[in-house]
Curated annotation (Swiss-Prot):
Keyword Ribosomal protein (UniProt): yes
Protein name according to UniProt: Large ribosomal subunit protein bL31
InterPro entries for this protein: Ribosomal_bL28/bL31-like_sf (IPR034704), Ribosomal_bL31 (IPR002150), Ribosomal_bL31_A (IPR027491), Ribosomal_bL31_sf (IPR042105)
Cofactor annotation remark: Binds 1 zinc ion per subunit.
GO cellular component: ribonucleoprotein complex; ribosome
Organism of provenance: Hahella chejuensis (strain KCTC 2396)
Role: Binds the 23S rRNA.
Keyword annotations of the record: Metal-binding, Ribonucleoprotein, Ribosomal protein, RNA-binding, rRNA-binding, Zinc
Length: 72
């Protein structure tokens, strides 16, 4: 490797809005604030919900009803 051409690679802390602090390494070289992490993200906590904006799921079920999965 050539000397002097690579960016600095330092340890930083990523602080989540839930209070969790994650130590990692980055070339950013400054501490960052994140909105969600694996401790509070619904996918990882098991509290995942389907958000139906505008009734799209109901509209789909009304339009296609029980036709899905049947072979003609």
């Amino acid at each position: 490797m050539k000397q002097g051409i690579h960016p600095e690679y330092k340890e930083i802390t990523a602080t989540c809005s839930c209070g969790n602090i994650i130590k990692t390494k980055s070339t950013l070289c400054e501490n960052i604030h994140i909105d969600v992490c694996s401790s509070c993200h619904p996918f990882y906590t098991g509290k995942q919900k389907v958000l139906d904006t505008g009734g799209r799921i109901d509209r789909f079920k009304k339009r296609f009803g029980g036709r899905m999965g049947r072979s003609s």
